[in-house]
Amino acid sequence: MSKTIVRKNESLDDALRRFKRTVSRNGTLQEYRKREFYEKPSVKRKLKSEAARKRKNKRRRY
Protein backbone atom coordinates (compact mmCIF):
# COMPACT_ATOMS: atom_id res chain seq x y z
CA MET A 1 0.00 0.00 0.00
CA SER A 2 1.50 3.30 -1.08
CA LYS A 3 1.01 6.40 0.99
CA THR A 4 1.62 9.91 -0.23
CA ILE A 5 1.25 12.81 2.15
CA VAL A 6 0.58 16.15 0.52
CA ARG A 7 3.31 18.52 1.62
CA LYS A 8 2.85 22.09 2.64
CA ASN A 9 2.51 24.41 -0.37
CA GLU A 10 2.46 21.42 -2.75
CA SER A 11 -0.06 21.35 -5.54
CA LEU A 12 -2.37 18.41 -5.92
CA ASP A 13 -0.89 17.66 -9.34
CA ASP A 14 2.59 17.32 -7.86
CA ALA A 15 1.32 15.04 -5.10
CA LEU A 16 -0.54 12.91 -7.64
CA ARG A 17 2.62 12.69 -9.76
CA ARG A 18 4.62 11.52 -6.72
CA PHE A 19 1.92 8.96 -5.89
CA LYS A 20 1.92 7.57 -9.42
CA ARG A 21 5.71 7.31 -9.34
CA THR A 22 5.72 5.37 -6.06
CA VAL A 23 2.97 3.05 -7.28
CA SER A 24 4.89 2.29 -10.47
CA ARG A 25 8.13 1.69 -8.55
CA ASN A 26 6.43 -0.69 -6.13
CA GLY A 27 4.81 -2.61 -8.97
CA THR A 28 1.39 -2.25 -7.35
CA LEU A 29 -0.46 -1.50 -10.55
CA GLN A 30 1.28 -4.29 -12.42
CA GLU A 31 0.40 -6.72 -9.64
CA TYR A 32 -3.22 -5.56 -9.72
CA ARG A 33 -3.48 -6.11 -13.46
CA LYS A 34 -1.93 -9.55 -13.10
CA ARG A 35 -4.44 -10.56 -10.42
CA GLU A 36 -7.48 -8.81 -11.89
CA PHE A 37 -8.82 -12.00 -13.43
CA TYR A 38 -8.29 -15.59 -12.35
CA GLU A 39 -5.83 -17.58 -14.43
CA LYS A 40 -5.90 -21.33 -14.39
CA PRO A 41 -2.62 -22.91 -13.30
CA SER A 42 -2.21 -24.48 -16.74
CA VAL A 43 -2.49 -21.05 -18.37
CA LYS A 44 0.06 -19.63 -15.92
CA ARG A 45 2.52 -22.40 -16.80
CA LYS A 46 1.97 -21.83 -20.51
CA LEU A 47 2.56 -18.08 -20.23
CA LYS A 48 5.62 -18.62 -18.07
CA SER A 49 7.18 -21.02 -20.58
CA GLU A 50 6.39 -18.68 -23.48
CA ALA A 51 8.05 -15.79 -21.66
CA ALA A 52 11.12 -17.93 -20.97
CA ARG A 53 11.30 -18.92 -24.63
CA LYS A 54 11.07 -15.27 -25.71
CA ARG A 55 13.84 -14.27 -23.29
CA LYS A 56 16.01 -17.13 -24.52
CA ASN A 57 15.52 -16.16 -28.17
CA LYS A 58 16.19 -12.52 -27.38
CA ARG A 59 19.47 -13.39 -25.66
CA ARG A 60 20.48 -15.63 -28.53
CA ARG A 61 20.13 -12.80 -31.05
CA TYR A 62 22.80 -10.62 -29.46
From Swiss-Prot:
Molecular function GO terms recorded = structural constituent of ribosome
Query: Among the entry's GO cellular component annotations, what is one?
Result: ribonucleoprotein complex
Any Gene Ontology biological process = translation
* Basic residues: bias regions: 53-62
**Bilayer-crossing regions:** none
Comp. bias (Basic and acidic residues) = 40-52
Asked if Ribonucleoprotein is a keyword of the record, the answer is yes
At the top level, the lineage of the source is: Bacteria
Q: Cite the Pfam families for this sequence.
A: Ribosomal_S21
Map out region (Disordered) in residue numbers. Answer: 40-62
User: What InterPro entries would the database entry show?
Assistant: Ribosomal_bS21, Ribosomal_bS21_CS, Ribosomal_bS21_sf
Q: Which UniProt keywords apply?
A: Ribonucleoprotein, Ribosomal protein
Family under the similarity heading: Belongs to the bacterial ribosomal protein bS21 family.
Q: Which PANTHER family match?
A: MITOCHONDRIAL 28S RIBOSOMAL PROTEIN S21 (PTHR21109), SMALL RIBOSOMAL SUBUNIT PROTEIN BS21 (PTHR21109:SF22)
Task: Name the HAMAP family for this protein.
Answer: Ribosomal_bS21
Q: Under what name is this protein listed?
A: Small ribosomal subunit protein bS21
Write down the species. Answer: Limosilactobacillus fermentum (strain NBRC 3956 / LMG 18251)
From the UniProt record, report the name of the gene that encodes this protein: rpsU
